[in-house]
Amino acid sequence: MSSSDGKLRYDGRVAVVTGAGAGLGREYALLFAERGAKVVVNDLGGTHSGDGASQRAADIVVDEIRKAGGEAVADYNSVIDGAKVIETAIKAFGRVDILVNNAGILRDRSLVKTSEQDWNLVNDVHLKGSFKCTQAAFPYMKKQNYGRIIMTSSNSGIYGNFGQVNYTAAKMGLIGLANTVAIEGARNNVLCNVIVPTAASRMTEGILPDILFNELKPKLIAPVVAYLCHESCEDNGSYIESAAGWATKLHMVRGKGAVLRPSLDDPVTIEYVKDVWSNVTDMSKAKHLGAIAEASGTLLEVLEKLKEGGGDAIEDAFEFNSKELITYALGIGASVKNAKDMRFLYENDADFAAIPTFFVLPGLLLQMSTDKLLSKALPNSQVDFSNILHGEQYLEIVDDLPTSGTLLTNGKVFDVMDKGSGAVVVTNSESFDESGRLLVRNQSTTFIVGAGKFGGKKDPIAGVVPLQPAPNRQPDATVQYTTSEDQAALYRLSGDKNPLHIDPQMALLAGFKTPILHGLCTLGFSVRAVLAQFADNNPALFKAVKVRFSGPVIPGQTLRVDLWKQGTRINFRTVVVETGKEVISGAYVDLKSSQAKL
């Protein structure tokens, strides 16, 4: 209710405040009474360590309230006898509407020095006392279909504090208690919230620095607690931190997590946990869960994916900005000599954008950085840079592409084939922006030399994106590019640091006389040709590309890209001019629309 002057009132309400003889509790009691509530001032009157008892502290506050024209009674019971505390309210005023569990003591000791008594006394007052008072008040509140309950936690409980094992355990326990009370009371308009105050009091005197102690006035927190207890406040299960005239809401969050096995039939190993630990502890995609059902629902989703034999078994974060986009564009031959390439090379260009094939990198780097997508597919085979060849690549752009940000990429093994001389592993990945929007899909086909003859199937399953042979006619257009002798050295700066492309010894081990150009670099050149010829260099028109890497390119060789237009599908092949050999075959780009230059 509110008065004519707009002030929130508590007329007709009965408020029980424990530990109200001083500090925060006193301020709560005075403010409730000032605004019309009838107040039970509970205080045992002991020291801050819980020793002794006295009626004086509660009596002084009751006198203050009465002298100001308010109504109040004192209660001297220990909060452990919560039923007696609430009985005082019922006998004096016939109801209880508000309960502020504020009473507390300190018995600070280090972990090793904390005695059984130190532990029990602190937990009895803070946690058990709050439970007993709440348990006694709850039936009255449910019957009258109204109640407001406050639990008092602490930053020490949330973050920990040296020498307070008993106190911090109790204060964190109060958050759990409040969560359940909030759930049980909701249907009867009995709401429960947590206050996390930092204020000067008998308990903190001598602990906090003087300058901080003097500014942490309990009076500045009282209005926050009072509002949480007003009938107009509908918060339930909230944790509110307040100090020095400031307040904020706290809540717990949970990261996206990581799946620790490929399927329900696979074990969880210590080594696998170690390998994905950075994903387990990654909080970049953390979110708040409002109920235990949400947490259980997420686990059910994970189990369903495991039941299907997959899921987001591997995850990786991919960060990029204009620098990475420009480095990539230079790596696939974009040049300032071509005015239309400036949109890919200058971050202040009005049309600055990413070349779409840049977004093969999140899936590729996920595969390279973890090495688990391939090795778990062939657990009995050696998989390393010396025996893997990139066979095919599919890239699909699902939504508008940003020019900077962080992408979370989920990858899994999709198919494994036995080709005799080696194995073919198909991996799928999806990349999401920070809001959870799906931007990119990648499908990569890798040939592992010498890993075949394991008795597997030879043909792909449905869902492996097929190639499409070029039409049997003359190309509609041809574009030619000359690569630099440093092309591979430049392209590898975008993240594909397979030594095969720069180290002569590694190239020899893989069966090449000299380091070869990355297949994905050749792909980038080829897609640039498609965009230039059929999309007016507009990357927004690009939808998807599929290619097979059918031969090596030596840096410095010339690439000829032959193009066939069939509606919005552009078939192409890429040939090394010096040798006449195809290096990309069965390839096509799908455009959203075409702006042909034939």
Swiss-Prot record:
Subcellular localization: Peroxisome
Cellular component terms (Gene Ontology): peroxisome
CDD domains to which the protein is assigned, alphabetical: HDE_HSD (cd03448), hydroxyacyl-CoA-like_DH_SDR_c-like (cd05353)
Residues noted as binding substrate in the record, renumbered to the chain: S154
Binding site for (3R)-3-hydroxydecanoyl-CoA: H390, G391, K419, D496, K497, N498, P499, L500, H501, G519, F549
Annotated MaoC-like domain residues: 469-586
Short motif Microbody targeting signal, span: 596-598
Pathway given in the UniProt record: Lipid metabolism; fatty acid beta-oxidation
GO molecular function: (3R)-hydroxyacyl-CoA dehydrogenase (NAD+) activity; 17-beta-hydroxysteroid dehydrogenase (NAD+) activity; 3-hydroxyacyl-CoA dehydratase activity; 3-hydroxyacyl-CoA dehydrogenase activity; enoyl-CoA hydratase activity; estradiol 17-beta-dehydrogenase [NAD(P)+] activity; protein homodimerization activity
Keywords in alphabetical order: Fatty acid metabolism, Lipid metabolism, Lyase, Multifunctional enzyme, NAD, Oxidoreductase, Peroxisome
Region annotation ((3R)-hydroxyacyl-CoA dehydrogenase) ranges: 1-309
Region (Enoyl-CoA hydratase 2): 310-598
SUPFAM superfamilies assigned to the protein according to its UniProt record, in alphabetical order: NAD(P)-binding Rossmann-fold domains, Thioesterase/thiol ester dehydrase-isomerase
Recorded catalytic activity of this chain's protein: a (3R)-3-hydroxyacyl-CoA + NAD(+) = a 3-oxoacyl-CoA + NADH + H(+); a (3R)-3-hydroxyacyl-CoA = a (2E)-enoyl-CoA + H2O
Signal sequence, start to end: none
Swiss-Prot/TrEMBL GO biological process terms: fatty acid beta-oxidation; fatty acid beta-oxidation using acyl-CoA oxidase
Miscellaneous: Complements functionally the S.cerevisiae peroxisomal MFE-2 in vivo.
Subunit-structure text: Homodimer.
Family note: Belongs to the short-chain dehydrogenases/reductases (SDR) family.
Protein name (database record): Peroxisomal multifunctional enzyme type 2
Classification lineage: Eukaryota, Metazoa, Ecdysozoa, Arthropoda, Hexapoda
